[in-house]
């Protein structure tokens, strides 16, 4: 009688099959985790923008508009109607926020990121009247929503 140690071929095949089944279940669950994190950063940037705009309004009685990119560059920026000044705001990396000045009582903004290819891929927020909402998904003033 020989004293063999080790696994048989059947035992190894069973382990490989079990690992394959676990991978087939786990990979789809975690595949879009990065996109979800980017969408969360877009919503976070919009919340921070609401706070920055309200602080700006407190000082100037006006809102600012413009396009802000996550690389720290403000590509375009517009004064409020009263020309009160410009908003200092930098979104997260690779996020682009376009703020549309409507009037001294409101504005709207949308946020996008090229890393998001699925849906939702755009988030928005508004301040002022509901007609300012960038999309029907944006239902509450000052509360970001994605579509």
Regions found by a protein language model. Name each.
Residues 51-147:
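Periplasmic/extracellular, small/polar-rich flexible segments of pilin-like filament-forming proteins
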Residues 16, 43, 50:
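Conserved catalytic core of two-component sensor histidine kinases
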Residues 29-46:
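Aliphatic-rich helix starts adjacent to a transmembrane/signal segment
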Residues 1-2, 55:
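Short, contiguous, well-ordered secondary-structure segments
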Residues 2-34:
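N-terminal single-pass transmembrane signal-anchor helix
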């Amino acid at each position: 009688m020989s004293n063999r140690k080790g696994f048989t071929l059947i035992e190894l095949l069973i382990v490989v099959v079990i690992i394959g089944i676990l991978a087939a279940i786990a990979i789809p669950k975690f595949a879009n985790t990065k996109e979800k994190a980017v969408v969360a950063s877009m919503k976070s940037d919009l919340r921070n923008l609401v706070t920055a705009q309200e602080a700006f309004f407190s000082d100037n009685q006006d809102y600012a508009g413009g396009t802000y990119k996550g690389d720290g560059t403000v590509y375009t920026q517009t004064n409020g109607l009263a020309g009160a000044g410009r908003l200092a705001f930098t979104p997260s990396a690779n996020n682009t926020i376009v703020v549309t000045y409507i009037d001294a009582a409101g504005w709207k903004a949308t946020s996008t990121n090229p890393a998001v290819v699925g849906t939702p891929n755009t988030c928005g927020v508004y301040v002022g009247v509901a007609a300012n909402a960038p999309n029907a998904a944006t239902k509450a003033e000052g509360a970001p929503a994605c579509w």
